[in-house]
């Protein structure tokens, strides 16, 4: 039996994208043991995992915040006698852990982050943009370089485990018509469709009697906005701040479609096999972060010569007007959602 240490410390969407690959690899090698090193709050994503996958939390905001703390963690991990390290992050902390193992003769295989190619993709115009190798494929490349061949067998977190229908009923009631999820927020402003325009999307969708909307977001300001939108409209429910991540994943698995930004919610939908319509602004699917198993045809975006200007959506707009988002009409988004549902165009 070989033992593999897998490292991916953040961010939530990137960790979510590792799951289809890790589960597929683990199922292809049932005689081996796999340990995933990630932040404690992200371990909840790994539900219904193969029996040969275990999780170790690394507190990057506490005991493992400093480089010395990371090295001490690595020294403790060496006692587990891993045969290889698969670094799916390739940042200072993960490289420090890998270096400790390399000093002990353990081979380390690292993700190609394609930094130079990403810089070219997000440069100011004039430029020619080309799709980079998808991140999920690059994750797979690392495992194959480590000698772990596999086929993609992952379908959904719930493929072999039924969702508790009582939980769904308690959260959402009895299903009538279409259930559509909407997650209008993201970590950075360059990924967020303007709230006034998104509210128009909510108006148009909630005006259809065959659609019930479920709004997803975080606590605090996001919850306040979503609660206000839901209170003012029929057949609109705010789920923000009310349920655990696992409960939300169960409900997402029952949606007919999920309208998202380029955010973690998009990847959550991919993990449970739910179709997604996504809205892209400063970022672009060509950067490789499109969700596992989903069709890029469902990405709504404006063809501007300045796009993409950022890999993560965290840079200011060169133009100053966020045209990449503001030029996307709410009616265009609604039309795509309804088309995806198989209904009549609004």
Positions of the model-derived regions?
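Catalytic machinery of carbohydrate-active enzymes
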Residues: 1-346
């Amino acid at each position: 039996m070989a033992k593999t240490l897998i490292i991916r410390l953040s961010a939530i969407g990137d960790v979510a994208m590792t799951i289809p690959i890790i589960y597929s690899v683990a199922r292809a090698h049932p005689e081996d043991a796999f340990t995933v090193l990630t932040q404690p709050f992200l371990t909840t994503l790994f539900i219904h995992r193969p029996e040969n996958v275990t999780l170790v939390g690394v507190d990057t905001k506490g005991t493992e915040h400093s480089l010395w703390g990371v090295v001490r963690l690595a020294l403790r991990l060496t006692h587990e006698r891993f045969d290889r390290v698969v670094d799916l992050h390739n940042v200072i902390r993960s490289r420090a852990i890998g270096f400790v193992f390399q000093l002990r003769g353990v081979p380390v295989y690292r993700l190609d982050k394609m930094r130079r190619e990403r810089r070219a993709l997000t440069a100011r115009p004039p430029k020619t943009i080309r799709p980079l190798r998808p991140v999920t494929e690059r994750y797979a490349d690392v495992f194959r370089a480590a000698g772990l061949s596999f086929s993609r067998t992952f379908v959904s977190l719930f493929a072999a485990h039924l969702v508790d229908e009582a939980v769904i009923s308690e959260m959402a009631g009895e299903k009538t018509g279409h259930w559509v999820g909407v997650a209008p927020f993201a970590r950075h402003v360059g990924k967020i469709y303007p709230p006034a325009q998104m509210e128009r999307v909510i108006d148009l969708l909630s005006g259809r009697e065959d659609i019930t909307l479920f709004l997803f977001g975080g606590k605090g300001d996001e919850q306040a906005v979503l609660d206000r939108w839901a209170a003012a409209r029929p057949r609109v429910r705010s789920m923000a701040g009310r349920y655990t991540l696992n409960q939300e994943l169960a409900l997402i698995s029952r949606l007919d479609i999920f309208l998202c930004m380029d955010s973690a919610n998009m990847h959550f939908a991919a993990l449970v096999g739910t179709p997604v319509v996504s809205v892209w602004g400063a970022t672009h699917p060509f950067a490789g972060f499109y969700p596992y198993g989903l069709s890029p045809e469902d990405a709504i975006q404006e063809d501007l010569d300045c796009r993409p200007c950022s890999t993560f959506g965290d840079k200011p707009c060169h133009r100053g007007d966020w045209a990449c988002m503001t030029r996307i009409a709410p009616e265009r988004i609604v039309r795509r959602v309804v088309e995806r549902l198989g209904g009549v165009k609004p």
